[in-house]
Amino acid sequence: MAAPTNTNLTMTPYAWGMLVTLSIVWGGTFFFQEIAVQELPVFTIVSIRVLIAALLLWAVTALTGNKLPSDAKIWAALFLLALVNNVVPFTLIVWGQQEISSGLAAILNATVPLFTVLIAHFVTTDEKLTRAKFAGVIIGLVGVVAIIGEDALEGIGLAVLAQLAVLVASLAYTFGGLYGRKIQAMGLTPLGISTGQLLASSVILIPVALLVD
């Protein structure tokens, strides 16, 4: 493991505000999905979610004078990112929330940083494990085992499968985040990447929802 580097970890009030806002918005999706799964099928929920987001970001892209990529290779990369970072995790989480609460789903989804720390060590050159990171990962994983443990002892029922589905979704987010770096190196802005992958997700999910749901 590499020795820790000196990094400025000071956060400004603006950064804290952005973090709190993001937490509220991101956490709120679990609450609304818990309500939605009582009335709508899984693929319909996920399709509506990505379509609304895609249209909003498309509008922002147009209003700010930005353009979507025209290169076929970039779109191929965006479709792969959409699959790993949107389609798979969104579907697994919504499916899981048919059996577990929004709070538990959110807690399990918070394992993304744990998976990222571990996987980034092997696939990046600038994010190696330190002793502190490794200790944090171990503590986090012990917490996850403690959360799932009681249900798992009663057998692999739907509740356990739902929790495992959310964990697999977290793992997908990890690979999506790391792959997103490669796409950014193609010259796309964060707005372009987000808009492109959500449009691609809509193209993938809407036909599936129409056929399956």
Q: Can you say where each PLM-predicted feature lies in the sequence?
A:
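Transmembrane alpha-helical segments that form core, pore/gating elements
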Residues: 57, 116-118, 122, 155-212
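Juxtamembrane helix-entry segments on the extracytoplasmic side of multipass membrane proteins
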Residues: 11-16, 38-43, 47, 70-76, ...
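Hydrophobic transmembrane alpha-helices of multi-pass small-molecule transport proteins
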Residues: 57, 79, 111, 119, ...
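Membrane-interface helix-cap regions at the ends of transmembrane helices
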Residues: 32-35, 39, 53-70, 141-157, ...
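Juxtamembrane helix-loop-helix junctions in multi-pass membrane proteins
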Residues: 24-54, 95, 101-103, 175-200
